[in-house]
Curated annotation (Swiss-Prot):
Pathway: Amino-acid biosynthesis; L-lysine biosynthesis via DAP pathway; LL-2,6-diaminopimelate from (S)-tetrahydrodipicolinate (succinylase route): step 1/3
InterPro entries the UniProt entry points to: DapD_Trfase_Hexpep_rpt_fam, Hexapep, THP_succinylTrfase_dom1, THP_succinylTrfase_N_sf, Trimer_LpxA-like_sf
GO biological process terms held by the UniProt record: diaminopimelate biosynthetic process; lysine biosynthetic process via diaminopimelate
Catalytic activity line of the entry: (S)-2,3,4,5-tetrahydrodipicolinate + succinyl-CoA + H2O = (S)-2-succinylamino-6-oxoheptanedioate + CoA
Transmembrane segments: none
Protein family (similarity comment): Belongs to the transferase hexapeptide repeat family.
Compartments reported by the entry: Cytoplasm
Subunit structure: Homotrimer.
EC number(s) stated in the UniProt entry for this protein: 2.3.1.117
NCBIfam families cross-referenced by the UniProt entry: dapD (TIGR00965), PRK11830.1 (NF008808)
Protein name: 2,3,4,5-tetrahydropyridine-2,6-dicarboxylate N-succinyltransferase
Residue sites binding substrate per the record: 104, 141
One GO MF term attached to the UniProt entry: nucleotidyltransferase activity
Species of origin: Photorhabdus laumondii subsp. laumondii (strain DSM 15139 / CIP 105565 / TT01) (Photorhabdus luminescens subsp. laumondii)
Length: 274
């Protein structure tokens, strides 16, 4: 794996000169191998190591290189044709392979090659971009977008129209992460490498980026870029110091543990916020 990483990093340093015509076989083979490993879930752009999320920047480099070294090509769909550098993930799947990998794909859901979909997932008409990792038992509901390299945990529900931000450039940026057992309400947007920690519930229409204030009403603490585990979050506003205006924020209205979440439905958690 170290050799593969070295090839990718060296090629990325010289990416300005790379084209489909000039790329050498070693680089092309390395990029193809990485995309296939991402596609199968054997590699992932980010993973939790000793309780901390670690981003493997060289894998993002490989994804970016794939755009430089591949020509656009015709992609056949059920109702149209497409023209792009990245093949669709399911273009060569047959019934046997779908049954073996154990997830459902409802038309016209789309996933690009290099995205991993684990067992018992359901893709309603949605979009999963290259480098994304969707773990077991997750529902990706209608019109949801899972951005490039985003990391979605086990037993997550991404409700209708949710946007999970992608990140390929700038290279140093970290992917957006939704940890296990989270619920993201309809039309919410989680972007810019924000981490939603395990067991959190995000209400409908909540927008969180790196600059969004995440206000804990119980403690008065303000978080940035991270929703603590077990938080129930709704949209809100915080007043300016002089009281002349207010600005949007996300409000942590309560904390719940796994036991409570198991006994109480999501709707109940969101309704009883007073």
């Amino acid at each position: 794996m170290q050799q593969l990483q070295s090839i990718i990093e060296s090629a990325f340093e010289n990416r300005a000169t790379l084209t489909p015509a000039t790329v050498n076989h070693e680089t092309r083979d390395a990029v193809t191998q990485v995309i296939n490993l991402l596609d199968s879930g054997k590699l992932r752009v980010a993973e939790k190591i000793d309780g901390q999320w670690v981003t493997h920047q060289w894998l993002k480099m490989a994804v970016l290189l794939s755009f430089r070294i591949n020509e656009n090509q015709i992609i056949d769909g059920t109702e149209s044709r497409y023209f792009d550098k990245v093949p669709m993930k399911f273009s060569d799947y047959d019934q046997t392979r779908f049954e073996k990998e154990g997830f459902r794909v409802v038309p016209p859901a789309a996933a690009r090659q290099g995205a991993f979909i684990a067992r018992n997932c359901v893709l309603m008409p949605s979009y999963v971009n290259i480098g994304a990792y969707v773990d077991e038992g997750t529902m990706v509901d209608t019109w949801t977008t899972v951005g490039s390299c985003a990391q979605i945990g086990k037993n997550v529900h991404l409700s209708g129209g949710v946007g999970i931000g992608g990140v390929l450039e700038p290279l140093q940026a970290n992917p957006t992460i939704i940890e296990d057992n989270c619920f993201i309400g309809a039309r919410s947007e989680i972007v810019e490498g924000v981490i939603i920690e395990e067991g959190s519930v995000i209400s409908m229409g909540v927008y969180i980026g790196q600059s969004t204030k995440i206000y804990d009403r119980e403690t008065g603490e303000i978080h940035y870029g991270r929703v603590p585990a077990g938080s129930v979050v709704v949209s809100g506003n915080l007043p300016s110091k002089d009281g002349s205006y207010s600005l949007y924020c996300a409000v942590i209205v309560k904390k719940v543990d796994a036991k409570t979440q198991g006994k109480v439905g999501i709707n109940e958690l969101l309704r009883s916020i007073d």
